[in-house]
Amino acid sequence: MAAGMMKDLEAFRKAQRADGPATILAIGTATPPNAVDQSSYPDYYFKITNSEHMTELKEKFRRMCDKSAIKKRYMYLTEEILKENPKVCEYMAPSLDARQDMVVVEVPRLGKEAAAKAIKEWGQPKSKITHVIFCTTSGVDMPGADYQLTKLLGLRPSVKRVMMYQQGCFAGGTVLRVAKDLAENNRGARVLVVCSEITAVTFRGPSDTHLDSMVGQALFGDGAAALIVGADPVPEVEKPCFELMWTAQTILPDSDGAIDGHLREVGLTFHLLKDVPGLISKNIEKSLVEAFQQFGISDWNQLFWIAHPGGPAILDQVEAKLNLDPKKLSATRQVLSDYGNMSSACVHFILDEMRKSSKEKGCSTTGEGLDVGVLFGFGPGLTVETVVLKSVPLLD
């Protein structure tokens, strides 16, 4: 009897799991309507924060913006909103309540906009969504943004939710890792993944004693990305664009304090050490070897690349360290140029850009004609997320 029960349990456990790997079935993105031109941003930023008397600092900030490789960003914070909330414009003024009032509404709202696009592309009824993963570094609330999104979209009350607050820029990889595990261990699961980021928590006036804060003011933008992740796609109905083959997370050695953020009365403060690009480029090959030796790949130019664009210096140093063909990071640099650093949402914007540009260029796969690729998330810790992706053939 015990043997029979064990056999039944094994069959039950096997029946719970999917047969194939997790796949990305749809991608949707959204930004606030307010677009900010990077070339004129220093003038606007110093004017709106009443800092025009700080002429040397303004020139330093202008150089930061010029070197950012960003042409445009999108921001929820308009001139009108900032004039109504002068404490948000000051450097280190108590302003958390005002910031929270903005983001607890706007983060799920922007997430809903991206999610609606992903659900439409997916083409299945939203009642088939079994899990929700919501990620944001913008504010904290209870019930969380996952709950608000569920209500806004009209998802089933029994949908299984995971909420990730305060993860930072590596979390675009984290959500894929968690979604993969959910999809592959729950047969028929369809996971709605949403990353929504609003810079209202980090915006503040300039300071000549906190230049790393100004780096953030020059780089960060607002955006939300949504994915549908599931295994065993329904033939002729669901159309995968990438497969999630393997994932890892690691803390880089000797990187304590390299990137950190603290939620205080003044909002979310960010601290960056100058050597962040060096730390990442020095350690990235180890992550690549760990990920790809099982696939027999050691030429990093054989891969398609999605790297979180923390800033141009990180991309430049990674490119140099690995002797990458400059075209490898073209999708990554395009998103940085068009949107800035949107924290966790960035890598999903890059996935979307890659599959679309691959189709436009007539490539044979969603991964620029290549079969296997890598997605990297870099963030506080210094934490690195690695995701091995398989592209999907593009049919004529």
Curated annotation (Swiss-Prot):
Q: Where is the active site?
A: C169
Q: What are the BP-aspect GO terms?
A: flavonoid biosynthetic process; polyketide biosynthetic process
Does the record bear Acyltransferase in its keywords? Answer: yes
The UniProt record lists the EC number as 2.3.1.74
Keywords recorded for this protein, A-Z = Acyltransferase, Flavonoid biosynthesis, Transferase
GO: which molecular function terms? naringenin-chalcone synthase activity
**What reaction is this protein's catalytic activity?**
(E)-4-coumaroyl-CoA + 3 malonyl-CoA + 3 H(+) = 2',4,4',6'-tetrahydroxychalcone + 3 CO2 + 4 CoA
Q: What SUPFAM superfamilies does the database record attribute to this sequence?
A: Thiolase-like
Q: Which InterPro entries match?
A: Chalcone/stilbene_synt_C, Chalcone/stilbene_synt_N, Chalcone/stilbene_synthase_AS, Polyketide_synthase_type-III, Thiolase-like
Q: In which pathway does it act?
A: Secondary metabolite biosynthesis; flavonoid biosynthesis
Nucleotidyltransferase among keywords: no
Q: Which domain of life is it from?
A: Eukaryota
Q: Supply the PANTHER family for this chain.
A: CHALCONE SYNTHASE (PTHR11877:SF14), HYDROXYMETHYLGLUTARYL-COA SYNTHASE (PTHR11877)
Job of this protein = The primary product of this enzyme is 4,2',4',6'-tetrahydroxychalcone (also termed naringenin-chalcone or chalcone) which can under specific conditions spontaneously isomerize into naringenin.
Family, similarity comment = Belongs to the thiolase-like superfamily. Chalcone/stilbene synthases family.
Q: What is this protein called?
A: Chalcone synthase
Gene name on record?
CHS
